[in-house]
């Protein structure tokens, strides 16, 4: 197999180029929507989509839970060389789990949309805009979860290019559809939601092509001990799931704290910050998703040297993204603001300090996120759990709540830089420990 015997460097960059596109599936839709709505509706539109942002984190994180969890086990089982097709039991179990989660999420958004958006920080004026945006998205809401599931398994089934093509097809439509529906059709925020909904459907249909192609080895089979496999998928995928859902939790905490301590102008600035952070986070996803199939399969085959080669390339890539996003954010903060809205003078006055302070989290954010993929791929879900929960809830949550009360309102923006620093200390120590003890022989599943 290519992943077990081919040269690591070309394989890694082949998968990186593909996974970079698929990892942006979350940000392409939301970033274009925020930019178009911000230009059409102004700061109020940007703030309304900041309220919706946690919904994206939730639905994508559920897709990552089953998509990454299932595909890691799929590749590790295949790398173990059994040759009996048993890896497809994990594909089937992941598909069943995805359908269940999609149905629950779909029911929740139809039945409790208003209370959910209010809890996420919407006041009366923002709630109406947020609900208008969600109106065309609700009928296809499960597709956003299923797209993540399929992308994960396509990468691990040797077809990362099709996963990328699906994102490009849906994303390109979304870009032009956003403009067409929002401005020429004068649909405003509803048009942005409509373009996003259609784009997700296009991505889904493109990925289905894999199942009629020659590369496809994915099969629906009867899984033995389904409950045990769903549990294994959940444990393996939990850390990646929590990285994304935690961003939603943090967005809710930030929304509520911003409205309490700083007001609506700061909330309008936070909308672009979410998009910048999502982009930086998706770059880290791409490194993790490129590395994971290679590392998982070679872990199953106990080829420690190939794992270390892949890790080295991944860390170089992580360093590049860290430098890029930090430098861009520090150099031209108001560039982001002008992309995402037609700003008022008051917003242009406060935005540079806010964005530059928050951007101090970007040097270490990609490393911490990548580490969760690495720990999962070498079957160390405990370490991945510690990183994701500390970063996504425990350390960050405490700082978001405590800093403005102790040091003043503007200290709120220091919460994420401090969080990333503290978590990175553990990440580096754990990565060194587990990399030194990689197995050289044997089957790890």
Regions of interest found by a model, annotated:
Residues 37-57, 125-129, 189-190, 229-236, ...:
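Interfacial/gating helices of multi-pass transporter permease domains
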Residues 14-33, 136, 147, 170, ...:
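Transmembrane helical elements of multi-pass membrane transporters/channels
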Residues 67, 137-155, 163-174, 192-207, ...:
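Short runs within selected transmembrane alpha-helices of multi-pass transporters and secretion channels
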Residues 1-19, 74-142, 184-238, 295-361, ...:
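Short alpha-helical transmembrane segments in multi-pass integral membrane proteins
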Residues 28-47, 117-124, 180-187, 248-275, ...:
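Helix-terminus/linker motif at the lipid-water interface of multi-pass membrane proteins
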Residues 3-40, 54-69, 73, 99-106, ...:
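N-terminal transmembrane alpha-helices
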Residues 46-107, 144-163, 269-327, 331-333, ...:
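Small-residue-rich hydrophobic transmembrane alpha-helices
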Residues 31-35, 107, 115, 149-153, ...:
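Alpha-helical transmembrane segments of multipass membrane proteins
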